[in-house]
Amino acid sequence: MATVTEVLTEPFTAQGVTLKSGPIKVHQEELPAVELSDIPLPPPSKEPTEVLSIDKPTPDYHVPRDPRLIRLTGVHPFNVEPPLTALYDEGFLTSPELFYVRNHGPVPLVKDEDIPNWEISIEGLVEKPLVLNFRDILQQYDQITAPITLVCAGNRRKEQNVVRKTKGFSWGSAGLSTALWTGPMMADILRSAKPLRKAKYVCMEGADKLPNGYYGTSIKLNWAMDPNRGIMLAHKMNGEDLRPDHGRPLRAVVPGQIGGRSVKWLKKLILTDAPSDNWYHIYDNRVLPTMVSPEMSSSDPNWWRDDRYAIYDLNVNSSVVYPEHKEVLDLASAGPSYNVKGYAYAGGGRRITRVEISLDKGKSWRLANISYAEDKYRDFEGDLFGGRVHMSWRETCFCWCFWSLDIAIPELENTDAILVRAMDEALALQPRDMYWSVLGMMNNPWFRVTITKENGTLRFEHPTDPTGPGGWMERVKKAGGDLVNGYWGERQAGEEPTEPEPEKEINMKKEGVNRIIDLQEFKKNSSDEKPWFIVNGEVYDGTAFLEGHPGGAQSIISSAGIDVSEEFLAIHTQTAKAMMPDYHIGTMDKASLEALKNDNAPQSDEPRATFLQSKSWTKATLVKRTDVSWDTRIFTFQLQHDKQTLGLPIGQHLMIKVADPTSKEAIIRSYTPISDTNQEGTMDLLVKIYFDTPTVKGGKMTMALEKLALGSEIDCKGPTGRFEYLGNGKILVSGKERHVSSFKMICGGTGITPIFQVLRAVMQDKQDPTSCVVLDGNRQEEDILCRADLDAYEALDSKKCKVVHTLTKAPDSWTGRRGRISEDLLKEHAIPDGKSMVLICGPEAMEKSARKILLEQGWAESDLHFF
């Protein structure tokens, strides 16, 4: 990233074309009070250079992307939002790699050499129709640079989908991003064509060819010509040429309106006397009246053709970012207050004038502090990224703002929810209740974060989780709460619980795929390189997901050539199931399915040297149970014979299948034994039992294990996992070998088990020079697991092994560290050096916190491994 001075002084070009504004100039003499460093500049950006394996088989095979983005519609088309906290933590401006994306279809392939001659036409009701190429646009028109927030009309739609399924796919609350856009004003382009008097609308059309034609929409001509509206064409974002997903090489940017009006890959501006008749303008981006059901909208197209229901300006909206969804606040280590913070925005250039927070269900409100970073550009006059920043005269607001408020911890303890609402300068206020509509767009009720008190902590929950099931709305609905009763589903006195709607079965088949596959073809195409597998009689090709699978390629390879219905359905989320149509290739005929069952039956009862098999389950018998503490056990299982070893590579895990004691349904989870990999005849599992509490249901698997009688059998299968330690600093990650000189091991609770496996392998080999630092976080001293072994390894060689324990509820006699695994602790013991790897396993909140801190400290994503 260039320094501030470099950004503001070097000449700028776009794809080799020099901009009209020429060399960059800064007019400091007019604004003596403004320092260059006061202007928000883009965050550090690292453009992806490799196409993700998940995209290689798709029409977007040419588009490198950031793997952190959350895919909302499976593999293709590409519709994503960034993780909410990552988006917020980047600051006012968003890097291109984290900028949200809404694509209706394939991204047009635009080669570098074609860009200077990229053409757009200005036609329709004009006196002088024009065709301009990219060079013309850069060289013949004044260039401006302005900060603008784009927001998808579907932002927060998942909340509507929980209440009642809409026709739109689910978005969380991160469907927005902000950038510095550079290019000419649309008005200047249109004036060149001399619009006729009867022209009322500007219809825009992109180069993305879709099933119903090219994507197009329209805005009013008087908006495009109004300098206060700031509507422009852009060829740069944050000083970089547009990337493919964001409209390379040219797009429209319509501030204050929904993102769907900012057409990407722009090819046409057509002036008309009526709104666009493009299919995507009519059947998308509308808020139909709430009484219109999906069935009504499908049977009567007149609902869609009424332009009164079209969306243009954004409405007022806000969201909480901190506390995060699923964040857990330990009251023992918490400070006197918590800084609640988030974002807000409005539409049509209107300023957010207040953000209010309530802790008593809306009976009383307090004002949050608001930061308007956009205003800093109004005090600056100069050129930035090849465009003039000239906002001192303009009072319209086109960007999000950040808000915050310190709330005393006792106040959070005494409430069950945080409510947030915003108001703009037109006194438009976020409503308390949701306005459900058939497309689920413009969802903007008060943002509510629930607080659950349990075991000395406060657990926070957002309305939904964009990555899968979760959030207080789903929880309340499953418990029989009526989410539209005006009380967020809370039952009032005398109110009976409602019967929750049956959960809709997710379709895992690709529409239009009618191919019948027999056993011979299935076996022929079921290899490590091309793993075909079966779920519920349907055939899937997992090749494209070998590299991207969170459990490692082996998880898919182990499924090759077999029916994995039971384990797939038991362990995969709704999000994972929704991805399956992208890999669906056909249906297996019934005769072949029956033959496959027999084909996959165990072939031999001959004793094996190793216990685990990657493609079939093997039974182990519970022979011993040792209580480590009131809620932690070591379960010892007998293998098939006394000389048999487990066969689990160091750093990997195995799947365990147990029948639910009540429903008898299979429960499948992954575990890492604490027994030595060379131990013969038995294996030991260290398990923390999650018992039922008055507010939280206990862990299904751990409760099932707790109820196992001696002599009971479990099923085991494996190995699985992306990581393997080979010894002497050599590791395999997703099949790729590398060398490290040290491990920084971060764990909490039973997350010690995979960490312990690697540590033991290093310490047992006296010739292994790899050093290890273990940061082990727990609540109380009795919760520290494997402590005797950890202390013994440190005593054996303190230079090779260092163990740091930290407790959140330490007794007065405790002489070790106190508190959570914090930023200070990681700065002290986990400094990035380019030769180390961080291994992490523990509660989700701990893992998320550690990941955020480590990335901020300079660790690369590829140097972090989460078990």
Swiss-Prot record:
Homodimer. FAD binds at residues 669-672, 686-691, 700-702, 753. This is Nitrate reductase [NADPH]. Its cofactor is FAD; heme; Mo-molybdopterin. Residues 615-726 form the FAD-binding FR-type domain. Nitrate reductase is a key enzyme involved in the first step of nitrate assimilation in plants, fungi and bacteria. The gene is niaD. GO terms for molecular function: FAD binding; heme binding; molybdenum ion binding; molybdopterin cofactor binding; nitrate reductase (NADPH) activity; sulfite oxidase activity. Transmembrane segments: none annotated. It comes from Aspergillus niger.
